[in-house]
Amino acid sequence: MNGSIRKMMRVTCGMLLMVMSGVSQAAELHLESRGGSGTQLRDGAKVATGRIICREAHTGFHVWMNERQVDGRAERYVVQSKDGRHELRVRTGGDGWSPVKGEGGKGVSRPGQEEQVFFDVMADGNQDIAPGEYRFSVGGACVVPQE
């Protein structure tokens, strides 16, 4: 196998369908890996791009990762390599997204009534990444008005 192929960082992302409990409002999530060749990631480099779709009435979107948060920061995470020996620091965000505020907040949110919006998973700081497979999962919800 070619050495440069072995050095490629693979990020495995799953597509998830999250349903908010007690509400008929469902959020569809689609995630596409941006992969990469080489072992250096610059701060802000896109690791994956996602799309959240809310087909029913809503006032915003909420996206989070199911990974270890960095220093309690809502939008920053550490992803372990499949073998558990290496780490990749990432953050979620993009145009119009803001970290969820408050203690215990997780992820980013964005106001809006569009049917779908895009978000990014980006490198958090300049990093030298060990070759390997880095898996992570992303969750999402449609924000509905309180009655």
Swiss-Prot record:
Signal listed as a keyword: yes
CDD domains the record matches: AfaD-like
InterPro entries for the chain: Adhesion_dom_sf, AfaD, Dr_adhesin_sf
Signal peptide: 1-26
Residue ranges, annotated region (Disordered): 91-111
Keyword annotations from UniProtKB, A to Z: Plasmid, Signal
Family according to the record: To E.coli AggB.
Name used for this protein in its record: Protein AfaD
Source organism of the structure: Escherichia coli
Name of the gene encoding the protein in the UniProt record: afaD
